[in-house]
Design a protein with these regions (language model features):
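Generic multipass alpha-helical transmembrane bundles of integral membrane proteins
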Residues: 105, 111-237
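N-terminal topogenic module of multi-pass integral membrane proteins
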Residues: 1-119, 227-280
């Protein structure tokens, strides 16, 4: 696979976390289908099964990129995303997959630099997603991500060009009838955004050197790239709120991923306190 692309990450069942995922997803499908049948949900049991599993998988995959050393966070995100899907109808996963690719672009979790077709494919996907969802700020986030990849360790300079393309399309969208900032954001939304920003800054500032390895080499992930990827994921979530308003909290599982990262961070901090050392 890596002979053709530097983007893909297969779910290798040799790893315990991947085996756990492959066991959990069918169970979630059955639960989603059962709940849809029990409560006579309009989309039906089959659609509910696939929707629930897709939301859970998307959240798991993104959180594995956001916090590669903490596999437990991914399963927290999986659980929250599935609950949000069943209880609140959080079925849209497009933004989650866009964020996943943007984060992977920056943190280089697969190892090698992107091939030209990888760049073109993700660039096109980001543009299409921004236009189809009418979220022009997504292009700003993508531009920052491409610029970071062209700047950080082992830079890929052609991504400056990809960033320029994103900015150009962003300006083109602004010239049309597109809303940049939603009108229904209230003080509480801004408080939550600020609180999440503070949490993400704390996570990045206190994170140790990564212990996870790249997929295709014996090299460990780069701390600056991992932290930059985390910030990119948060920016992707925030831009949806700014454009779509308060409804974006529950439209997509991306905030489940952010919450899972922060919960994982809080758990690590609590367990570092004197008297909280686990024995055995």
């Amino acid at each position: 696979m890596y002979r053709f692309t530097s983007i893909a990450r297969p779910i290798d069942p040799a790893y315990l976390t991947n085996r756990a995922l492959l066991m959990v997803l069918p169970l979630l499908m059955l639960l989603s289908a059962g709940l849809a049948s029990l409560y006579d949900i309009d989309k039906g049991p089959v659609a509910a099964a696939f929707s629930g599993a897709l939301a859970a998988f998307a959240a798991w995959a993104l959180t594995r990129e956001l916090a590669p050393d903490y596999s437990g966070a991914a399963f927290v995100a999986l659980s929250l995303a599935w609950i949000a899907n069943v209880a609140f109808g959080a079925t849209s996963v497009l933004l989650v997959f866009v964020a996943l690719l943007i984060v992977r672009l920056v943190n280089r979790s697969t190892g090698p630099r992107w091939r030209p077709l990888d760049t073109l494919g993700v660039l096109g996907f980001c543009i299409w997603s921004a236009v189809s969802t009418q979220q022009p700020l997504l292009l700003v986030v993508a531009a920052v991500a491409f610029s970071l990849d062209a700047t950080l360790k082992e830079p890929l300079r052609r991504h400056y060009f990809a960033a320029a393309v994103c900015v150009s399309v962003f300006i083109w969208m602004l010239l049309g009838d597109v809303r940049l900032i939603a009108a229904d954001l209230v003080a509480w939304d801004w408080v939550l955004i600020a609180a999440s920003a503070g949490g993400i800054i704390l996570v990045a500032a206190t994170s140790p050197e990564p212990v996870s390895y790249c997929d295709t080499s014996p090299d460990r992930l780069d701390r600056a790239r991992v932290n930059a990827g985390l910030v990119m994921g948060w920016l992707a979530a925030v831009q949806a709120l700014l454009t779509d308003g308060s409804a974006a909290w529950l439209e997509t599982p991306i905030w489940a991923c952010m919450i899972a990262v922060l919960v994982s961070f809080a758990d690590r901090i609590v367990n570092r306190w004197p008297g909280n050392t686990r024995v055995g």
